[in-house]
């Protein structure tokens, strides 16, 4: 479907942006809204691969996922908006990385929702809910000793691994509860509000033993795959808690289960997993001290409107020749 303004001698052919398949009611709506807001652009909503292949010969910009066999038709493509904040494994491949196309993503739209989810895990562990929830299911009235099962947050340290938008929001919220926040980030050099110390990635192993909560927010990249393993869990405090809301492939679940059952860490809160859905027979389901949510940390209001605003902003920047928002380092996948 082509959403186009009339052309003529005084109105030359506009730049084309292709909405790659598959389409949804939302992407079709975006195409209509963008066409009304930006008459300088043609918006082509491709319903199938045949339409996408034909349109790619002329499109200078696109939204969605482009597989290798379609990429070879994209001779004019200069900008690709990824459909996620952190696209899944396989989105970036050698031919796409080598292609001159610039890629942007939807990072920043989930910061407040995921930040709140992380603090839900932190507060649950700090107040011993990982002990009391199983007791509730057993209808068992049993209090932990008054001085046990509680972490006084103003005396606790949170180690936030990955201090981008989400990590920065986690740091701000944790600091508001009085926690001392240490950040680890490969790229960031400015220290965001709430972070007491900011370190490089090669300092992580030395910092793990200092943290009461290790909070992983990093994306899945070649460098972070299997990032949290048995060795790193053993470096944590035995009273420490691990939280992962980044990407599942960054953490070895077998190693996590072994560490939990060996008493090497006190508990774990997970929203992402190596395999999703998490298989019903996975030992993580029955491992004590674990809180699991089914990849819902980013759920919340306003997400679709935030996505649209980023696309609209980047369309305007693209037309004006300005730097694009949320530009990705393709070789590093984020």
Spans of model-derived segments:
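N-terminal Rossmann-fold NAD(P) dinucleotide-binding loop
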Residues: 167-168
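Phosphate-binding beta-alpha-beta segment of Rossmann-like dinucleotide-binding domains, i.e.
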Residues: 98-157, 324
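Short beta->alpha connector loops at strand-helix junctions that form conserved
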Residues: 83, 102-109, 202, 246
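Rossmann-like adenosine-cofactor binding region
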Residues: 187-283
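An N-terminal-biased, well-structured beta-alpha scaffold segment characteristic
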Residues: 3, 8-104, 229-231
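Glycine-rich, N-terminal phosphate-binding loop of Rossmann-like dinucleotide-binding domains
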Residues: 21, 66, 84, 216-219, ...
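Glycine-rich Rossmann-fold phosphate-binding loop(s) that bind the pyrophosphate
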Residues: 163-164
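Rossmann-like dinucleotide-binding domain for NAD(H)/NADP(H)
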Residues: 239, 245-334
């Amino acid at each position: 479907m082509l959403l186009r303004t009339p052309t003529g001698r005084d109105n030359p052919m506009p730049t084309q942006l292709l909405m790659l398949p598959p389409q949804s009611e939302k992407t079709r709506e975006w195409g209509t809204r963008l066409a009304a807001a930006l008459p300088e652009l043609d918006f082509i909503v491709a319903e199938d691969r045949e339409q996408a292949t034909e349109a790619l010969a002329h499109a200078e910009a696109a939204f969605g996922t482009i597989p290798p066999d379609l990429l070879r038709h994209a001779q004019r493509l200069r900008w690709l908006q990824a459909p996620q904040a952190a696209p899944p494994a396989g989105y970036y491949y050698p031919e796409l990385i080598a292609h001159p196309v610039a890629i942007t993503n939807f990072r920043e739209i989930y910061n407040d929702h995921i930040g709140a989810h992380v603090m839900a895990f932190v507060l649950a562990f700090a107040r011993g809910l990982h002990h009391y929830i199983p007791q509730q299911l057993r209808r068992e009235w049993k209090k932990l000793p008054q001085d046990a099962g509680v972490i006084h947050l103003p005396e606790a340290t949170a180690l936030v691994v990955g201090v981008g938008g989400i990590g920065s929001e986690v740091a701000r919220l944790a600091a508001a509860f009085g926690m001392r926040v240490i950040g680890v980030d490969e790229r960031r050099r400015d220290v965001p509000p709430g972070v007491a110390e900011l370190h490089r990635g090669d300092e992580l192993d030395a910092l793990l033993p200092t943290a009461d909560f290790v909070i992983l927010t990093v994306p899945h990249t070649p460098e972070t795959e299997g990032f949290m393993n048995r060795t790193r869990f053993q470096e944590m405090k035995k009273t420490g808690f691990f939280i992962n809301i980044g990407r599942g492939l960054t953490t070895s679940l077998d190693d996590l289960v072994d560490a939990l059952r060996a008493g090497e860490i006190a508990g774990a809160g997970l929203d992402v997993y190596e395999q999703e859905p998490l298989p019903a027979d996975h030992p993580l389901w029955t491992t004590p001290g674990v809180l699991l949510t089914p990849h819902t940390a980013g759920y919340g209001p306003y997400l679709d409107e935030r996505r649209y605003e980023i696309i609209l902003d980047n369309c305007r920047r693209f037309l004006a020749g300005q730097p694009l928002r949320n530009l990705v380092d393709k070789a590093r996948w984020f």
